[in-house]
Amino acid sequence: MKNQVDLVRSYNDKDNVAHFLNSTLNKGQQKIVKDDLLTGKTKLLYVAPETMTKEENINFFKELEISFFAVDEAHCISEWGHDFRPEYRRLREMMDLIDETKPVIALTATATPKVQSDIVKNLGLRKPKIFISSYNRPNLYYEIQPKINLEQTNKSIVRFVQQHKNKSGI
């Protein structure tokens, strides 16, 4: 979540435009996030499902003017998914407690048809629009390099990281 928030903030001159709320934050940090939300400074909030299921947070979220709910990594909802997390299956219940009238978007890059169906059912989505695209996207570059030995591999990784500062690469 932190890296997503950092990316959003990099496009804006205000650090409080986006926040995350999860168990890694201490009480003081949580208070700052909640204060920014209450004053309307924060426009985008990332919340871990485990955090969203806490009653105190549900009551807090009810006080906010929420535009919509976005469920990222939605495949985690499905018991058929590769990353199943039980708290994800309670998201619809939590969203209904907060504001059942708000729209929901569910996002994933790894849902089989069975997982897609489970997501739709579990989130109670009615006539959802489903968009599917290829993994092979023109903005991605693929390269496979042989692993000669550990020392050479480590040097190659270090060289790659140094040559591509502030960029992605696996």
Model features per residue range: what roles?
Residues 62-63, 67-132, 151-154:
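Post-DEXD/H (motif II) to motif III coupling segment of the RecA-like Helicase ATP-binding lobe
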Residues 2-47, 130-131:
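Conserved nucleic-acid-binding Ia/Ib motif block in the N-terminal RecA-like helicase ATPase lobe
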Residues 25-68, 76-82:
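Conserved helix/coil segment N-terminal to the catalytic DExD/H
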Residues 137-145, 166-170:
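Inter-lobe coupling/hinge region of RecA-like P-loop helicase motors
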Residues 46, 104, 168-170:
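Conserved RecA-like ASCE P-loop NTPase motor core of nucleic-acid helicases/translocases
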Residues 10-13, 35-40, 59-64, 95-102, ...:
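Conserved catalytic network of the ASCE P-loop NTPase/AAA+ motor domain
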Residues 1-4, 163-170:
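Conserved strand-helix element at the start of the C-terminal RecA-like helicase core
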Residues 1-3, 25-27, 51-53, 75-76, ...:
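Conserved nucleotide-binding/hydrolysis micro-motifs of P-loop NTPases
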